[in-house]
Amino acid sequence: MKDPYRSTINYYQLEAPAAAATYESVDFGGVTDRVLRYIPERGRLLEVGCGSGRDAAYYLGRGFDVTATDASAHMLSQAFRLHPDLEGHLVHHQLPNPLPFADGAFDVVTAMAVLMHLTAADAETALGELARVTRPGGIVAYSVSTNRPNLDPEGFDPKGRYFVCRNEDEWSALNSASGFLPVDSWTSRDLNGRVGVQWVTFVCRRG
């Protein structure tokens, strides 16, 4: 089996401009606005897997003290190109490696369309890291795809990206094991219009 992380990151390294353009074209406002219902104004916010910087820039514009990470250096370059206000807010980091931040450093942590790229064991580790850097009582919000019809037997899509598709109940169990208290969750269709791709978004409170 090829290295799932190297293969996934390599796609984003090679296709960063096109991937960033796709992300920028998607109206994600319904998700971010729903998350905003539960988070404090102008808090410390970490976005893990910021991609094109779309959401990080949105939160920055709303007055949050934003830190945004991504595993692809080329995607970070696109984020800065598209959103120059993110200068000084971008950090190169790859899960499931420990996040380079202190315990309880953030009021809010988001990870949209990230954790499903991790192996089963590493997703658990990553959720533990999200919990660690969130202050007690803080909010963790993340989305994952629960179904992708075009994966090969090893979990790779035609672009070489690796996915693990758990169902909503399995992710909920991982949330509980990570010490997260449920606040809100919802399922949704794919905003890019891909047939058969389904998503679930969780908003949790760190216990």
Predicted regions and their residues:
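Class I SAM-dependent methyltransferase SAM/SAH-binding core
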Residues: 46, 52-97
